[in-house]
């Protein structure tokens, strides 16, 4: 897999947990965003942004922390221009220090918790949008942004306000207050005190425009979609792996599945149907297409016209001779 690594382009690191019941060395309790105490294994992936596909993976013991695995993997693949993306649970000053003192040119973009102290409370309480550095649009959504320099290590905090997200958060808060869904007692008008709704922030050692940071991290959301695909759609589940060799085989099959899934994402994004269907939609649409045999004749069952049009648009020919 190392031969697939681009030498002068950016790649991204990300990891996910798979819970397993196997009694073997790779299965161990460790950190995961769900804070589950079940034994797990960690799957660390390297993704290429220009080619937009998974390039490299490692199966790790569940107790191995990502910061150590990131550094070891950097050395293993010989990466010279890499960006680490992680979830909200990863950021801490010790983790940042480990990456920055590794002696490697590691760049990172980490999301911050909504209650982070790196953004002053007064910033949220100020309701005047002139406090922002600027604004851009993404998918017909208005995104305001502010960039802060923090500390003396060349790190920056990028803070955003998504007005559409803010409206959704406010609606959700009021609905919970009206129906007493929360353990704490709130009145609907307490929504006026929730100054952080619609805000989200990242910390990064990249000194670039806030829009670039936003777009780079959005690629992780595409990766999350693929991890969801692995966990929910691919039947090779590590839950019932009996030993490390069996688990390694499952990881390889998952990798092959992920390559096809990313190929589907790329083909769909380049077609006229990229706003109409998701990769999961296409998989559901085509799962009943079968090859049937009558006597000595083999044929593909009838395909609905709309599905055939979509398949043709993304370059899939299910009627080809193999």
Question: For each predicted feature, which ranges?
Answer:
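Anion-binding and metal-coordination hotspots
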Residues: 1-322
């Amino acid at each position: 897999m190392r031969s697939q690594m681009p030498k002068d382009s950016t790649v991204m690191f990300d990891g996910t947990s798979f819970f397993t019941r196997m009694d073997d060395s790779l299965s161990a309790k460790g950190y995961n965003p769900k804070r589950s105490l079940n034994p797990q294994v960690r799957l660390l992936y390297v993704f290429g942004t220009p080619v937009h596909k998974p390039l490299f993976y490692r199966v790790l013991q569940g107790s191995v922390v990502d910061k150590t695995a990131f550094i070891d993997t950097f050395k293993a693949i010989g990466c010279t221009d890499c960006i680490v993306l992680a979830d909200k649970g990863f950021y801490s000053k010790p983790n940042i220090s480990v990456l920055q003192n590794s002696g490697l040119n590691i760049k990172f973009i980490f999301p911050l918790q909504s209650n982070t102290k790196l953004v002053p409370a007064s910033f949220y309480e100020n309701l005047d949008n002139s406090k922002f550095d600027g604004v851009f649009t993404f998918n017909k959504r208005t995104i305001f942004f502010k960039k802060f320099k923090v500390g003396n290590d060349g790190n920056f905090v990028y803070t955003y306000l998504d007005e559409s997200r803010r409206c959704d958060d406010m609606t959700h808060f009021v609905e919970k207050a009206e129906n007493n869904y929360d353990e704490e007692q709130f009145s609907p008008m307490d929504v006026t005190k929730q100054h952080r709704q619609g805000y989200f922030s990242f910390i990064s050692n990249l000194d670039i425009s806030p829009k670039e940071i936003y777009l780079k991290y959005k690629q992780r959301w595409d990766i999350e979609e693929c991890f969801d695909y692995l966990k929910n759609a691919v039947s090779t589940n590590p839950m019932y792996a009996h030993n490390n060799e069996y688990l390694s085989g499952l990881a390889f099959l998952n990798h092959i599945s992920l390559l096809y899934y990313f190929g589907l994402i790329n083909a769909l994004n380049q077609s006229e149907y990229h706003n109409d269907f998701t990769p999961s939609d296409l998989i559901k649409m085509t799962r009943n297409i079968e090859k049937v045999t009558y006597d000595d004749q083999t044929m593909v069952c009838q395909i609905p016209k709309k599905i055939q049009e979509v398949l043709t648009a993304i370059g899939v020919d299910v009627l080809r001779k193999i």
